Design a protein with these regions (language model features):
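Paired intracellular helix-loop junctions of major facilitator superfamily
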Residues: 179-189, 218
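Extracytoplasmic gate region of multi-pass secondary transporters
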Residues: 59-121, 172, 176, 206-207
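Transmembrane alpha-helical cores of Major Facilitator Superfamily
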Residues: 3, 75, 107-111, 193-201
Length: 259
């Protein structure tokens, strides 16, 4: 079983090794014209950012309050993601599903989530908007968790878990496009690393709190509400960042109509 689960990652690793290059100039699957256009576009973007920033050090990325704010946003989405991974099978089992049924049922929301993520990311790119795509996705996931805490049938809990999966999956692409809107170079590398490191702590806190709360209450409901609160907080933080960006002409954080 473990070998079968590892095979897709092994195959993908080989594909990435040969096809995912570090620069457009090395991408053999692009035409010469496409490589030249991408290189020029990246250089133009870098010059535009450099003109607005006196320096772009790693420390600048770590000290930027927007980085810490996005880390908090990612904390909430990570809490939701790992809650699904760890507790969804147990929640489904509590409605009387067999082990085989749990395997199939648990896979369904993930398939829908992948489709939603692709469509939502394309819509975000097409509209050149980031903030509300993250906000809407986080609120959908929060609503799904609240719904999951109040359902009484296997069908309704699957609907709830699908909503959560769709929301969390859809939030990722627009969220990860945000740091490079105001950081570049070493600052971007440090900032993204900080967001990832701090945010991933949510993957520990969310599932742990569900277990702790379930031991105290005998139910999953209040634990799910707790994680829903973290996702709602993520949405609120993005709202605040967007409002600040709209008020300040020099603030380069994702607000409506920013690419």
């Amino acid at each position: 079983m473990f070998v079968l689960e590892a095979l897709p990652a092994l195959v993908l690793g080989v594909v990435v090794l040969f096809f995912l290059t570090d620069r457009p100039a090395k991408a053999k699957w692009l035409t010469d014209q496409e490589r030249a256009w991408l290189e020029n576009a990246m250089q133009d973007e870098e010059r535009a950012r450099a003109a607005k920033q006196s320096h772009s050090s790693a420390w600048r990325g770590l000290a930027d309050i927007r980085v810490l704010a996005l880390a908090l946003v990612y904390f909430g989405t990570s809490a939701g993601l790992y809650t699904l991974g760890i507790w969804s099978p147990q929640i489904i089992r509590s409605f009387g599903a067999s082990s085989l049924e749990i395997g199939f049922l648990n896979a369904f929301p993930a398939v829908i989530g992948v489709i939603a993520m692709i469509l939502w990311a394309r819509h975000s790119d097409r509209t050149k908007e980031r903030s509300w795509h993250v906000i809407g996705a986080c609120l959908l996931a929060a609503a799904g968790l609240i719904y999951a805490g109040n359902v009484s049938t296997l069908f309704t809990v699957m609907v709830a878990l699908t909503l959560v999966t769709v929301g969390i999956s859809a939030s990722k692409p627009p969220l990860w496009s945000m740091p490079t809107l105001f950081l570049s170079g070493p600052a971007a590398a440090a900032g993204i690393a900080a967001i990832n490191s701090i945010g991933n702590l949510g993957g520990f806190v969310g599932p742990m709190m569900i277990g702790v709360i379930r031991e105290q209450t005998g139910s999953y409901s209040w634990g799910l509400y707790f994680v829903a609160g973290l996702l709602a907080l993520s949405a609120l933080v993005v709202m605040i960042l967007s409002a600040r960006a709209n008020k300040s002409p020099t603030a380069e954080l994702p607000h409506p109509h920013t690419h």
